């Protein structure tokens, strides 16, 4: 409490309270000597904005000073005009000590009652708020005492804790003062009498203060010292406690309501309070009950106060305000009811413990125990002295209040009597009298209470005046203590004020009614009484603290000893403050005795304080106890109590403690307990009395009826208001007396404070010593701990190192094992490669036959396409695309690229741009014939290839991939669907051709059919990969797809351009979209009617539509996912049909079925046959599949990669999963259905159709999948599945996750390469030729190519996948492989992009197993080999897409190198072997088709050639349409691809689990040696010629002969003969070089502006300017061309400056320096120039 606040006497308070310019502080509002309250904002004002007291209100009605200055500001803010709260409180203490001795004699019961009721409230609140004030928290008081030392020293906690404690004390005092005012109004006459009784009052106040403190500390004291009044107090506790409890609960509720945040009472006291609250809650509940018995003893005083307050409530509402103003004070002060109570009680507790100043005051406060501060002070000393005493402020009220109250109170009364003699005896007498009197007063008419209140107020004023004078004397002490008690108080007031501002807004709204009514009366009463009470309470408390000190000194009670210790600690902590607090405590005890009518009032106040503390404890704990009247505070304190409990740290103090005194007291408590516990206790008591009065007043208005006198509080409030008004006048009179008394009391208080502070200093020293000892112990312990940890760490490190070494050894062993495995794998792979070579030879023969059939099929397809073109006006563009396709697949590929770029650029939605582009672009018409090329086959292959070429070409793939691939995905999906329809038509046409092919393949095709029946995947694999018998034509469409895939990896651009221009024209052509969809629907209807059920066709359409709908990016992702997943999913479909089956089961049933359905639909569609399929396919699938595809594309792009990869059959999240599962299921069903459904002819036909679809759709899909990367669209999936499913189903069956990935890349590669081979051969590919022709015409006819695509891709992929699944089911070996590989494939599908090489290795290992299975069945083997190579091709394509994304050249080189590897067989890396095997498989498939077995060598060569062609088409086809591939080329390509694929299949069959390490990733890299890089420019600088050139040639050094040679050479090389002459102008080579450089620099000025020369940077601009300004000769201008080593100008200036300095220093040196400087600068200039 800074002296400024202390300066405020009761008169100042009156003046201040009368002046509306400032808001009356808590002290002003609370009591006469509320100079401190001057800056305490009126809670009524804060709450309601209006105060009934008006100018007389002791509290500030302006902006809350506390809100402003919560901490140190608040110290002064509460009593701004008067001075620090501490000073005011000291003055008040002194005044109250003198006055309260007088008054307490005269009006001990009313002020004491107010104090004690406040003290009870505070104690209750302290106890309640400091719910956890357990012995631990009491022990915390020691820490708080230490903190008190800090607080005395103005520690960090000072502002918060000290001000909290100050605020809490102030508010308690204010409540008490309000009670006292109310009582003083009754008791002003009695106050005078009590002033006579002042020694007794001091003693009784001291005793009641100890009772309050001790009672608050221990209900025992309350009981025992007030045993006489114990019955009264118990009655009163019963009476008052129930109202108090009600008020406490009300105040708790109100405070909880009003102050969500309590004013942060010192958190450390909260710990004590929490500890107390924990132990004390139970104890306190018991003790509160007991206390309420002692409180009934105390509450007799308190209940006298309360009854008087009840009586006075009409008059002064002071008794209620004892409780209610306690609550109100706590509310208003702390949280304006509970907050101040809490601040007072819990905060004091906490602050007593935490705030040394508080503990200085704590002893007084504890004795006052109305103020939690003393409780804390005592608590920490009590902890030292007797933990119960610490508790007793809060807990001891619960615990020891009975014991201590009786014992300590009696002993304190005795000691105070001994100490103070008359006053103590009078105070004991008064306390007893006042407890009786309070009971009486409660029973007494308000007049007697008013007299007592008046006396209390007068005594309070006098004691406060004395205290104020003391406080002014204590100013210096208060300078210390001002931080602690005053600052605690001011912090309390600030906190209370802030909380009050928060609460005051609420609490004043609530209490403004009360405060307006009661506060003015109660403030008059309170201000008189509260100032007296605060001062008297403070003085009484200080006197009590002194007496407690004396009682402690008497050591009758260990608690008294502890109190003394606390007092001593408080005094030690606050030696100066202790004296002040002693004075203040004496004044307070005196004033309290006066205020409490010594015994009764002090007992009542101590009881009320102790009970308030216990109530505060209870309130703080839970406010469940002893405070009926403090229900608002209980609410606030309930919040505060809980928040205090939570606020052990004090975080919620402010929140919970809305009353400033509670929060600041709490905040101050830690510091007061730490610093000025005694003074803080005194302050707490003073403030607590005021705060209690305030809270009682306010609470008594709303709360006191609620709490204790809630029934009569309304009347009593009004009466109290009137009485307060009277009492204010009386208080003003009393203030003068009180000022004198206060001066006396302050002197006594200061003496006591000095004593207390000495005690506290001693205690603190002991504490510090103990703390140092503990710290040393802790340090030693920490050192030991650190040592242990270091040892442990070292041991752990050693163990870790051992483990690391072990792991390294394990890794070495693993690596060796893996090396051995890899060697074995390579051996197995080589055998498989040989096996595949043989297979490829067979395949090539079959491929040649198939190629011939494909030629026929292509012819039919072209006819179909012509029909389709004729049918579709949109397809006229597509017909142009067909022409262009026929002419140049590369052009269509370019078109596809451009259109895919289109899409990327223009069409985020796959449908619109793909449709439009399909419609408008050759791609759309001819399925990716960007130039509207009429050759839809070429366009399809081109479109497909551009996908791969884009995949191959990183820029195209990356840039255009999403857009173009999306477009192409849509286009290829639509084109695929249209191709599927076309393929269906073609397959209808080709069904004969396919059947013929398959009959031609019948050797293999019989196997294939048997295997197709077993598993259509095998049939498709045979058709497509395994035997490529039906596939051979398809594989010239489809195996070309696979070689196309491979070559698309290699020649992705070209072959994809060619084959996938067909396929992708179908698949991607956006323009075809609608007509494609319709035509595909019609075709699917027709074909679905013929071959596939409408359901199949419809799901196909749905699936196609699904992808069409999905965004391009999604579609492309899905397409790539499809590619990966098609390959993978075809493996899974073979294994699990987990491939992305977006289509319904019937869509998927068989690709063959779907293809046949497509054929039928395509055939019907060309004829515009609206079969049920078209009706079924187009409408439902577009919706389902469109949404599904859109969702699936989006989700399958994400989840299809994951879900489909993880479980292809598991519904790729949303549609993708459903597509996958549908496709799988549909494939399985469809395959089963088609196996059963499709005849052997149909099976071949389906194979052809599937192969066509697979080739067109598969390559489209592969391309799309490739192109789209992971964009998976059902169309792409079905495209992949249709094309890839045949080969990739084999792969799916035969390859695991790696096969999946290979299926993705191989299907892509296989389908695309087979298509590319077909395109290269000139066949559009079976599916490409027939399906593409059909698809082109169909897709052009199909209004929605997406639906066609979906139909094609879905039906194709589903059919082939279902067949594959059927085959898998039939072939348990393949099922096993599928099971092995499918999960892996799914895993690898997820990881395929990342780990496809690994997947390939694993697929190879799996494929080795599969090869064994295939070797069991040569057809199976062939199909597997083909599928594996195709998968590998697809994987290669993926690899190549990855690598092609890096560079198309790489993929070309890779494909070439793969072919070379296959040819060489030496450089068969796992990946290379996979690719080679894929190529060889494709080659063998194609070679099977290509009847010419002699072409095996050709196909190996042709693989290289076709790969070269593919690479060329990739390179050129990326930008150009792919050139049509002749059948011979295709056969060679297919043969080479098949051989390489066989080799790769062998390797893939070998794939026993290979690690990424095992994978020879070099296969991804082009085999051709890197071009020798020219040495870097940096190295060129150091060639001899360059060095000499830089140096320049000097005639002298080089010699005339050499120089002549050089000159001649230079002249020859120089362009302008003129320049040659000037080359060697100078003798020195360096000068020549410099001149030459200048010329070059000048010449390059405006020409060589660097890479980023859109704008001239300043550097370049300035350089140019410098160069242009320069002379050729290198004059000074030239110095700026190159940054001069020396800035000549700067040098000159610096030299001049140096010279000047040197001249100044040594004028003689100037000349030499000038002389030196001149030459230096000149020389340097010359050098620089």
Swiss-Prot record:
Residues recorded as bearing Phosphothreonine in the entry: 263, 353, 363, 958, 1109
ZnF segments: C3H1-type: 36-64
Record GO biological process: mRNA processing; regulation of stem cell population maintenance; RNA splicing
GO cellular component: nuclear speck; nucleoplasm; nucleus; RNA N6-methyladenosine methyltransferase complex
Residue runs in coiled coils: 162-196, 706-865
PTM sites of type Phosphoserine: 64, 77, 198, 207, 209, 211, 242, 265, 316, 318, 324, 327, 369, 371, 380, 704, 907, 909, 913, 921, 924, 929, 949, 951, 953, 1069, 1086, 1090, 1093, 1256, 1259, 1273, 1275, 1295, 1427, 1443, 1447, 1467, 1470, 1499, 1526
Keywords: Coiled coil, Developmental protein, Isopeptide bond, Metal-binding, mRNA processing, mRNA splicing, Nucleus, Phosphoprotein, Repeat, Ubl conjugation, Zinc, Zinc-finger
GO MF term set: zinc ion binding
Gene3D superfamilies (UniProt xref): Zinc finger, CCCH-type (4.10.1000.10)
Basic and acidic residues biased stretches: 76-136, 182-193, 283-315, 393-528, 581-636, 655-701, 710-897, 920-938, 957-1035, 1047-1065, 1114-1137, 1149-1159, 1228-1253, 1278-1288, 1296-1351, 1359-1440, 1447-1482, 1490-1499
Amino acid composition bias (Low complexity), ranges on this chain: 204-213, 321-345, 1160-1176, 1184-1218
Subcellular location: Nucleus speckle; Nucleus, Nucleoplasm
Pfam families linked to this entry: zf-CCCH
Glycyl lysine isopeptide (Lys-Gly) (interchain with G-Cter in SUMO2) crosslink site(s): 179
Bias (Basic residues) ranges: 214-224, 1036-1046, 1072-1086
Annotated segments matching region Disordered: 1-40, 57-156, 182-528, 581-1527
Subunit structure: Component of the WMM complex, a N6-methyltransferase complex composed of a catalytic subcomplex, named MAC, and of an associated subcomplex, named MACOM. The MAC subcomplex is composed of METTL3 and METTL14. The MACOM subcomplex is composed of WTAP, ZC3H13, CBLL1/HAKAI, VIRMA, and, in some cases of RBM15 (RBM15 or RBM15B). Also a component of a MACOM-like complex, named WTAP complex, composed of WTAP, ZC3H13, CBLL1/HAKAI, VIRMA, RBM15, BCLAF1 and THRAP3.
Protein role: Associated component of the WMM complex, a complex that mediates N6-methyladenosine (m6A) methylation of RNAs, a modification that plays a role in the efficiency of mRNA splicing and RNA processing. Acts as a key regulator of m6A methylation by promoting m6A methylation of mRNAs at the 3'-UTR. Controls embryonic stem cells (ESCs) pluripotency via its role in m6A methylation. In the WMM complex, anchors component of the MACOM subcomplex in the nucleus. Also required for bridging WTAP to the RNA-binding component RBM15 (RBM15 or RBM15B).
Name the UniProt record assigns to this protein: Zinc finger CCCH domain-containing protein 13
Organism per entry: Mus musculus
Gene name for this UniProt entry: Zc3h13
């Amino acid at each position: 409490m800074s002296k400024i606040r202390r300066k405020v006497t009761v008169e100042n308070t009156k003046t201040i309270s009368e002046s509306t310019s400032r808001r009356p502080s808590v002290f002003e509002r609370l009591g006469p000597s509320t100079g401190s309250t001057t800056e305490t904002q009126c809670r009524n004002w804060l709450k309601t904005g209006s105060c009934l007291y008006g100018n007389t209100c002791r509290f500030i009605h302006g902006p809350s000073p506390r809100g402003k200055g919560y901490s140190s500001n608040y110290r002064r803010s509460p009593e701004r005009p008067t001075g620090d709260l501490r000073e005011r409180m000291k003055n008040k203490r002194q005044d109250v000590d003198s006055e309260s001795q007088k008054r307490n004699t005269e009006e001990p019961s009313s002020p004491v009652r107010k104090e004690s009721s406040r003290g009870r409230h505070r104690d209750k609140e302290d106890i309640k708020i400091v719910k956890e004030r357990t012995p631990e928290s009491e022990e915390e008081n020691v820490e708080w005492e230490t903190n008190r030392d800090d607080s005395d020293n103005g520690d960090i906690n000072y502002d918060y804790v000290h001000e909290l404690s100050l605020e809490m004390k102030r508010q308690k005092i204010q409540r008490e003062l309000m009670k006292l005012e109310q009582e003083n109004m009754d008791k002003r006459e009695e106050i005078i009498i009590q002033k006579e009784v002042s020694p007794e009052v001091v003693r009784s106040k001291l005793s009641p203060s100890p009772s309050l403190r001790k009672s608050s500390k221990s209900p025992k004291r309350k009981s025992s010292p007030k045993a006489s009044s114990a019955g009264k107090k118990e009655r009163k506790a019963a009476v008052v406690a129930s109202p108090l409890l009600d008020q406490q609960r009300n105040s708790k509720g109100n405070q909880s309501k009003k102050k969500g945040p309590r004013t942060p009472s010192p958190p450390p006291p909260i710990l004590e309070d929490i500890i107390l609250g924990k132990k004390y809650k139970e104890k306190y509940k018991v003790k509160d009950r007991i206390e309420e018995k002692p409180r009934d003893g105390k509450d007799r005083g308190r209940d006298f106060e309360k009854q008087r307050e009840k009586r006075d409530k009409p008059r002064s509402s002071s008794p209620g305000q004892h409780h209610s103003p306690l609550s109100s004070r706590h509310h208003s002060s702390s949280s304006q009811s509970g907050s101040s109570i809490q601040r007072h009680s819990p905060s004091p507790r906490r602050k007593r413990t935490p705030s040394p100043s508080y503990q200085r005051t704590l002893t007084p406060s504890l004795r006052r125990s109305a103020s939690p501060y003393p409780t804390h002070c005592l608590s920490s000393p009590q902890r030292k002295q007797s933990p119960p005493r610490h508790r007793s402020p809060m807990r001891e009220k619960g615990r020891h209040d009975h014991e201590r109250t009786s014992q300590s109170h009696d002993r304190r009364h005795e000691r105070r009597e001994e100490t103070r003699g008359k006053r103590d005896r009078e105070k004991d007498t008064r306390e007893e009298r006042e407890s009786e009197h309070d009971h009486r007063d409660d029973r007494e008419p308000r007049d007697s209470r008013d007299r007592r209140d008046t006396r209390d107020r007068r005594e309070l004023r006098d004691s406060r005046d004395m205290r104020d004078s003391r406080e002014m004397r204590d100013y210096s002490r208060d300078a210390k203590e001002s931080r602690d008690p005053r600052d605690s108080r001011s912090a309390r007031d600030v906190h209370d004020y802030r909380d009050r501002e928060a609460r005051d807004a609420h609490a004043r709204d609530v209490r403004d009614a009360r405060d307006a009514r009661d506060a003015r009366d109660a403030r008059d009463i309170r201000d008189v009484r509260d100032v007296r009470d605060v001062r008297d309470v403070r003085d009484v408390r200080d006197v009590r603290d002194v007496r407690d000190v004396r009682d402690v000194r008497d050591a009758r009670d260990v608690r008294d000893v502890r109190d003394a210790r606390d007092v001593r600690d408080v005094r030690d902590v606050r030696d100066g403050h202790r004296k002040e607090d002693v004075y203040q405590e004496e004044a307070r005890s005196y004033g309290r005795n006066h205020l409490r009518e010594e015994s009764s009032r002090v007992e009542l106040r101590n009881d009320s304080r102790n009970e308030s503390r216990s109530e505060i404890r209870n309130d703080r704990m839970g406010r469940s106890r002893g405070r009926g009247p403090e229900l608002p505070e209980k609410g606030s304190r309930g919040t505060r109590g809980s928040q205090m409990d939570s606020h052990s740290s004090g975080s919620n103090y402010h929140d919970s403690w809305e009353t400033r005194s509670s929060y600041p007291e709490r905040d101050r408590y830690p510091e007061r307990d730490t610093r000025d516990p005694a003074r803080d206790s005194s302050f707490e008591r003073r403030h607590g009395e005021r705060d209690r009065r305030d809270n009682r007043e306010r609470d008594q208005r709303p709360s006191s009826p609620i709490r204790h006198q809630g029934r009569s509080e309304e009347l009593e409030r009004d009466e109290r208001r009137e009485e307060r008004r009277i009492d204010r006048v009386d208080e003003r009179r009393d203030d003068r007396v009180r000022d004198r008394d206060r001066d006396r009391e302050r002197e006594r208080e200061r003496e006591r404070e000095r004593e207390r502070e000495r005690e506290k200093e001693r205690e603190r020293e002991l504490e510090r010593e103990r703390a140092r000892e503990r710290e040393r112990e802790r340090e030693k312990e920490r050192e030991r701990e650190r040592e242990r940890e270091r040892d442990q760490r070292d041991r752990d490190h050693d163990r870790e190192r051992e483990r690391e070494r072990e792991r390294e050894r394990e890794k070495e062993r693993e690596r060796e094992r893996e090396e051995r495995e890899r060697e074995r794998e390579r051996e197995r792979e080589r055998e498989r490669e040989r096996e595949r070579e043989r297979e490829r030879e067979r395949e090539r023969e079959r491929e040649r036959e198939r190629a011939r059939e494909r030629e026929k099929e292509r012819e039919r397809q072209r006819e179909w396409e012509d029909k389709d073109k004729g049918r579709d006006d949109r397809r006229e563009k597509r017909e142009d695309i067909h022409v262009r396709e026929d002419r140049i697949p590369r052009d269509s590929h370019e078109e596809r690229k451009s259109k895919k770029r289109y899409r990327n650029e223009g069409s985020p939605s796959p449908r619109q741009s793909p449709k439009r582009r399909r419609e408008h672009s050759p791609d759309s018409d001819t399925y990716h014939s960007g130039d509207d090329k009429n050759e839809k086959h070429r366009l399809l292959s081109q479109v497909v290839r551009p996908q791969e070429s884009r995949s191959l070409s990183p820029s195209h793939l990356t840039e255009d991939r999403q857009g173009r691939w999306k477009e192409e995905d849509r286009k290829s999906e639509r084109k695929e669907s249209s191709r599927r329809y076309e393929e269906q038509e073609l397959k209808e046409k080709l069904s004969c051709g396919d059947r013929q092919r398959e009959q031609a393949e019948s050797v293999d095709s019989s196997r294939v059919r048997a295997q197709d029946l077993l598993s259509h995947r095998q049939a498709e694999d045979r058709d497509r990969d395994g035997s490529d018998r039906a596939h051979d034509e398809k594989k010239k469409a489809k195996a070309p797809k696979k070689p196309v895939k491979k070559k698309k990896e290699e020649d992705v651009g070209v072959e994809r351009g060619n084959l996938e221009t067909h396929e992708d024209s179908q698949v991607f052509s956006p323009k075809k979209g609608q007509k494609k969809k319709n035509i595909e629907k019609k075709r699917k209807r027709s074909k679905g009617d013929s071959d596939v059920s409408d359901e199949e066709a419809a799901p196909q359409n749905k699936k196609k539509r699904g992808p069409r709908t999905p965004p391009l990016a999604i579609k492309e992702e899905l397409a790539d996912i499809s590619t990966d997943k098609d390959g993978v999913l075809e493996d899974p479909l073979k294994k699990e049909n987990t491939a992305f089956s977006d289509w319904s089961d019937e869509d998927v049933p068989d690709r063959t079925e779907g293809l046949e359905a497509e054929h039928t639909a395509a055939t019907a569609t060309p004829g515009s046959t609206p079969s049920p399929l078209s009706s079924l396919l187009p409408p439902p699938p577009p919706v389902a599949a469109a949404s599904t595809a859109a969702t699936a594309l989006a989700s399958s792009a994400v989840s299809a990669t994951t879900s489909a990869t993880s479980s292809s059959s598991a519904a790729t999240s949303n549609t993708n999963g459903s597509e996958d599962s549908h496709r799988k299921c549909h494939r399985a069903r469809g395959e089963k259905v088609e196996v059963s459904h499709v005849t052997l002819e149909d099976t071949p036909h389906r194979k052809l159709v599937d192969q066509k679809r697979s080739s067109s759709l598969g390559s489209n899909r592969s391309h799309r999948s490739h192109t789209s990367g992971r964009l998976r669209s059902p169309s792409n999936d079905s495209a992949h599945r249709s094309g890839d499913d045949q080969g990739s189903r084999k792969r799916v069956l035969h390859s695991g996750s790696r096969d999946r990935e290979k299926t993705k890349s191989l299907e892509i590669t296989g389908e695309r390469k087979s298509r590319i081979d077909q395109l290269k051969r000139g066949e559009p590919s079976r599916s490409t030729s027939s399906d593409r022709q059909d698809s082109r015409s169909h897709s052009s006819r199909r209004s929605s190519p997406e639906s066609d695509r979906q139909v094609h891709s879905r039906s194709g992929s589903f059919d082939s996948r279902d067949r594959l699944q059927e085959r898998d089911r039939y072939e348990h070996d393949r099922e096993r492989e599928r099971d092995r590989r499918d999960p892996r494939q799914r895993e690898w599908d997820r990881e395929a992009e990342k780990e496809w090489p690994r997947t390939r290795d694993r697929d190879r290992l799996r494929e080795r197993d599969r090869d064994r299975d295939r070797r069991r069945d040569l057809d199976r083997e062939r199909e597997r080999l083909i599928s594996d190579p195709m998968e590998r091709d697809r994987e290669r394509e993926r690899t190549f897409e990855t690598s092609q994304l890096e560079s198309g050249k790489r993929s070309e080189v890779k494909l070439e190198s793969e072919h070379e590897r296959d040819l060489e067989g030496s450089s068969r890396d796992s990946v290379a072997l996979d690719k080679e095997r894929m190529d060889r498989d494709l080659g063998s498939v194609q070679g099977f088709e290509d009847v010419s077995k002699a072409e095996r060598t050709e196909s190996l060569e042709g693989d290289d050639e076709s790969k070269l062609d593919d690479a060329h088409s990739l390179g050129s086809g990326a930008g150009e349409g792919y050139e049509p591939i002749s059948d011979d080329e295709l056969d060679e390509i297919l043969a080479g691809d098949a051989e390489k694929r066989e080799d790769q299949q062998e390797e893939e069959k070998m794939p026993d689990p290979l690690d990424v390490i095992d994978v020879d990733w070099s296969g991804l890299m082009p085999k051709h040696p890197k071009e020798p890089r020219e040495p870097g420019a940096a190295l060129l600088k150091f060639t001899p010629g360059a060095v000499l050139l830089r140096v320049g040639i000097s005639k002298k050094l080089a010699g005339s002969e050499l120089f002549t040679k050089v000159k001649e050479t230079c002249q020859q090389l120089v362009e302008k003969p003129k320049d040659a002459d000037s080359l060697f102008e100078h003798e020195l080579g360096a000068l020549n070089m410099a001149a030459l450089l200048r010329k070059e620099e000048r010449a390059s000025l405006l020409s060589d502006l660097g890479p980023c020369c859109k704008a001239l940077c300043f550097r370049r601009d300035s350089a140019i300017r410098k160069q242009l300004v320069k002379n050729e000769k290198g004059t000074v201008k030239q110095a700026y061309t190159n940054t001069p080593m020396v800035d000549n100008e700067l040098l000159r200036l610096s030299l001049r400056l140096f010279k000047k300095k040197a001249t100044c220093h040594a004028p003689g040196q100037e000349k030499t320096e000038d002389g030196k400087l001149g030459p230096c600068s000149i020389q340097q200039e010359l050098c620089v120039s």
